Every structure is written in C-alpha cells, then in structure tokens.
C-alpha cells in the first residue's frame, strides 16, 4: 500500500513511521509534483491546522487535494487533519473559527479547536475504538467533534460522550493521535 503523508507542517514523521510499522510504503507530499505518484491512502497529520491550511494554499496543493478527496481517495486524518476536513469549525469558545476557504469542508461534522485545552490540557486515556476495548488514546491540544451533520457518519469512538473518531465514506478522522499509541 502506498501512503502519501502530507508533510507541510506538523507530526508527519510520526505519521509516516506509524504507517511503515503497519507494512505500508510511505512518501511525503510537500509539493504538487508529489501528487503525481500513485496514492492508496492520503494522511493528514496532527499539527497546527491554520498553518497547514495556509501552506496548502500557498503551495498550490489545496485544490488538487480537495479534488482527490472528493473523487474518493481514502483519507486518514488526525487532529489538525480532522479540523482541515471538517464542514464547520469553531474556535475554543464555540464561535465560528477559521475562514471557510482555509479548510476543505468535506467531512460532515462540526469541530471545536483546542476543545480540551491548550498544551497543558493534553492527556492520555483508554477507550473503545471500532468495537475494540482498551485502546490507548493520546489527546494533544485536541479538537472535539461537537456535531455530526449527516446520518451516515459512523462514530468509531467517544470520550465523555463526544465522538472522537468518525468514518464517512472515504474519510476516517480522529481527534486523538493513534500514531502515538503503537
């Protein structure tokens, strides 16, 4: 399996290592030419969603990536990646956040940035993921999914009653960092 790891900012090295440990071949996506390779799975790492969104626009990657996602390319997104994909984004106070043009808007959920607090609010816990109990979950400045906007969005895990991982069509997205729990 060929996994393209978005590598413009954030924890892309950890994401690539995670997929290599699963037996995948990985390569970094940093420029438009990188999208010419065969990609079986596109991954969005954790990091700073505002910076990632700006860089994707500046590098000319935003529209080609959005077209591939909307065309059905499988996507695995973590934390900042979830924020970039969400249909609606709120700031930590629940007010509309980042400009809509800065995110993809392809995943029918509402997310709240930094919902569990800033860096000092980061934590580890265990939970059930996709029916598997006792799965370690690491939350780092994590967003929260505050609303699921389509009936066919599958909730894969929850924390304190809020969805923390979802699957919709070709997109699987996490508020927590599965790549840090292997």
PLM features per residue range, with description:
Residues 49-127:
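Cysteine-nucleophile active-site neighborhood
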């Amino acid at each position: 399996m060929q996994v393209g790891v978005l590598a413009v900012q954030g924890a892309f090295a950890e994401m690539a290592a995670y997929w290599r440990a699963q037996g995948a071949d990985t390569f970094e996506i940093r420029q438009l030419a990188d999208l010419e390779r065969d990609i079986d799975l596109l991954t969005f790492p954790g990091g700073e969603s505002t910076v990632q969104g700006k860089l994707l626009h500046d590098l000319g990657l935003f529209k080609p990536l959005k077209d591939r996602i909307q065309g059905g390319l499988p996507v695995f997104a973590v934390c900042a990646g979830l924020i970039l994909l969400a249909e609606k984004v709120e700031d930590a106070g629940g007010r509309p956040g980042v400009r809509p043009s800065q995110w993809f808007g392809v995943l029918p959920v509402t997310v709240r940035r930094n919902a569990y607090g800033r860096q000092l609010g980061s934590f580890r816990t265990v939970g059930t993921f996709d029916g598997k109990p006792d799965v370690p979950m690491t939350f780092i400045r994590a967003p929260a999914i505050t609303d699921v906007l389509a009936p066919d969005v599958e909730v894969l895990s929850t924390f304190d009653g809020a969805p923390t991982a979802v699957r919709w069509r070709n997109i699987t997205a996490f508020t927590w960092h599965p790549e840090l729990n292997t």
